[in-house]
């Protein structure tokens, strides 16, 4: 996003609105999210799928050392896009919120309560001098007394609940896949396959199974898919598309 001369004065202070009602530092934080690798979530009746394209840029990097899907509590997980260090801070805060709630009330925290707490923190970082907005967005998924839940959080502190959504640089490509193929009556297995397909399309057909990180949250709790299962799923989904294209 190009900086116009008239707006430079409003870049200096995070708490100053421009004449047209914009907070430029929040907009720049959103740009950081757009530059991040694609993360997505899909909600079905059986549970919620979270997936991320980790984009390992060098063969010298151990793929398992890069983590962008996190467990928050036994029934909640999160996927991130944007600045990884900022995401870690928010994930740790979310874990503390969940643990504190469980210790205080003797029961697991509802997903929307946790999401609102994290978004409240994000919003505070848009109001005070000496800090900057978090340059990351989170997809927070879980299962609570209200059923399966999937939320998207914005650097401004805004939150929205979704059936399926994506963040990061491949957001639009993934949403195009969801618009065409998502169904509310999908099985969890079908949702996982859709996540793999959407991540592949979002990468402009350049990603590999090694770059994918996928987790599921259902009534049994949070769990990440094993590498072997992701490779088998990737081969089945991507292989079938290549066969159709021949």
UniProtKB/Swiss-Prot annotation:
Name of the gene: psmA
PANTHER family associated with the record: PROTEASOME SUBUNIT ALPHA/BETA
Activity regulation: The formation of the proteasomal ATPase PAN-20S proteasome complex, via the docking of the C-termini of PAN into the intersubunit pockets in the alpha-rings, triggers opening of the gate for substrate entry. Interconversion between the open-gate and close-gate conformations leads to a dynamic regulation of the 20S proteasome proteolysis activity.
The protein's name: Proteasome subunit alpha
GO MF, any single term: threonine-type endopeptidase activity
NCBIfam families noted in UniProt: arc_protsome_A, PRK03996.1
Compartments, as annotated in UniProt: Cytoplasm
GO annotations of cellular component type: cytoplasm; proteasome core complex, alpha-subunit complex
Family recorded in the similarity comment: Belongs to the peptidase T1A family.
Gene Ontology biological process: proteasomal protein catabolic process; ubiquitin-dependent protein catabolic process
InterPro entries tied to this protein: Ntn_hydrolases_N, Proteasome_alpha, Proteasome_alpha-type, Proteasome_asu_arc, Proteasome_asu_N, Proteasome_sua/b
Keywords, comma-separated and alphabetical: Cytoplasm, Proteasome
Subunit structure, as described in the record: The 20S proteasome core is composed of 14 alpha and 14 beta subunits that assemble into four stacked heptameric rings, resulting in a barrel-shaped structure. The two inner rings, each composed of seven catalytic beta subunits, are sandwiched by two outer rings, each composed of seven alpha subunits. The catalytic chamber with the active sites is on the inside of the barrel. Has a gated structure, the ends of the cylinder being occluded by the N-termini of the alpha-subunits. Is capped at one or both ends by the proteasome regulatory ATPase, PAN.
Phosphoprotein keyword on record: no
Task of the protein: Component of the proteasome core, a large protease complex with broad specificity involved in protein degradation.
